[in-house]
Amino acid sequence: MNFLDESFLLAVSFVIFIYLIYRPAKKAILNSLDTKIIEIQEKVLKAKKLKEDAALLFEQTKVQIQKLEALRSQMIEESDKATQKIIQDKTKAMEEFLEQKKADAIQLIQNQKLIASKDLQDEFCDEVITLVSKYFRSVQLSERSIAKNLMDKSDFAHNASHATHLH
């Protein structure tokens, strides 16, 4: 093998050519790879940041949901209390109304009872007067003798009660 052989020189020249081309290309490839690595690292950092932000947002949302649940429970409890109070107030008002109506009805019944009793007394008195008048007319007494009889009986009753007071 001859070192000056053309195929050997061609091979050495090709290796040198590749080396000379590879050297600047190596820098460009390494720079390109470094740039890609930096871009990927930035994307990974952004993804981590997004993940952390999402986790933080999730926790904040979870806290807000818990607060809303507590607020909802409180509102339900307050509305239940308000409803119970309204029911109690309306029940009390209804009971008072019914008691008032009951008292009014009792008063009305008593008034009607008094009116009916007075009407019966008036009818009874009218009937007694009519019967007494008919009796006195039937026995053919004059009005004067009727009045005298009534006066005598009235004086007798008055004297009798006066006499009992003296004893």
From Swiss-Prot:
Its main location: membrane. InterPro entries: ATP_synth_b/b'su_bac/chlpt. It is a single-pass membrane protein. The keyword Metal-binding does not apply. Keywords: ATP synthesis, Cell inner membrane, Cell membrane, CF(0), Hydrogen ion transport, Ion transport, Membrane, Transmembrane, Transmembrane helix, Transport. GO terms for cellular component: plasma membrane; proton-transporting ATP synthase complex. Pfam families: ATP-synt_B. It is found in: Cell inner membrane. The keyword Transmembrane applies. Belongs to the ATPase B chain family. This is ATP synthase subunit b.
